[in-house]
Amino acid sequence: MAGVFCFALILLGSSCSGIVVPFKSNKKIDLASGYSAMSGQDFEDHLASLKLPFMKSPGVKIYGLNEATQKYIESLISDILGNNEIFFKRLKKGTVTIIDSEAPLHFSLPKGEIFLSRGLITKYLKNESMLVCVLSYELVRSEKMLYPRQTIIPIGYLSLEKMIGLSRLSLDEKMEVHKWSHHLTIRSGFDGEYYLSWLQAQNRNTADFILQVGDVNQINREESLFKAFLIKSTNEEQVIHRKESSKSFYTFINRIREVT
C-alpha cells in the first residue's frame, strides 16, 4: 500500500507544474486605508519567490534589457514611487522583466516584480503615459498584495498560465486598482487620459487580450465603470502632464522590436 501511495505522489509531481493550496482570509479589501489583502511577510516572500521557477520554465523566453533600456524603465518606476510616497509605504523599488512573447501580457509579483510581454510593448503601448499606466497598475497590486488567496508550490516549473492566474481580481478589486493607478499616473506627471485609452484598447481587442483579461464581459464593464468614475471626478489635482513621449521611450520601444 505504501508503495502505491508513493507512486501516486510521483505521478502527480511529474504531471503538474504546481500544486495550488487555498489561502483563506476573512478580511475585506480597503485600498484607501492601506490594508493589504494578502497580509503576512511569509506569504509575500512565498509569492515573490515564484519569479525564479517561472523564468526557468520550459517555453518561457526572457528578453534581457541592455543597460540603457534598463535604466529607462527603472527611472519610470522611480518617478511613480517617488511622486507617490504617501501611497507606497512598502515598495521602495521595482524591477521589470520582459517576456519574449507576442501575446499582450502584464502581471506582477510582490516586492515590485513586474512582467511585461514584448507583444504588449510593441503593439499596444503607443505612448509613454500608457506605459506608466500599466506600470502603476502593477505597482499598486504589488504594494497592496492584491493576489489570489492561495499558495502555489512549484514542482520543477511554473507555467505562464498560472502566473497570469495570479492577476485575476474581482471587478470591485480591479476598479479600485484602476482608480488608484489613474491617480498615481497623474501625480507622477503623466497624462491620465491614456488610462481610459488603455482600457479601451483591451476592450476593442479582446481576441488578443483574452489570456490577460480572462472574462471578456468584465473588461467591457471595467471600461463603462471607469468612464463613470472620470465623469464624477471633479477635484483632480492640477499637475503639469507630459503630453509628448520622451526620446528614451521611443528608444526603448525600438530596442524591444529588434528581438528576433
Can you describe what each PLM-predicted range is?
Residues 135-144, 176, 180:
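Active-site His/Glu-centered metal-binding helix of metallohydrolases
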Residues 145, 151-172:
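Substrate-binding clefts and substrate-entry loops adjacent to catalytic sites
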Residues 115-116, 130-138:
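Short alpha-helical catalytic segment bearing the HExxH-like zincin motif
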Residues 3-13:
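Bacterial N-terminal signal peptides
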Residues 16-71, 83-91, 122, 172-260:
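C-terminal capping/extension segments of zinc metalloprotease domains
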Residues 59, 82, 97-101, 117-118:
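N-terminal post-signal-peptidase region of extra-cytosolic proteins
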Residues 97-112:
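Catalytic zinc-binding patch centered on the HExxH motif and its immediate surroundings
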Residues 121-129, 138-155, 189:
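Catalytic Zn2+-binding segment of zinc metalloproteases
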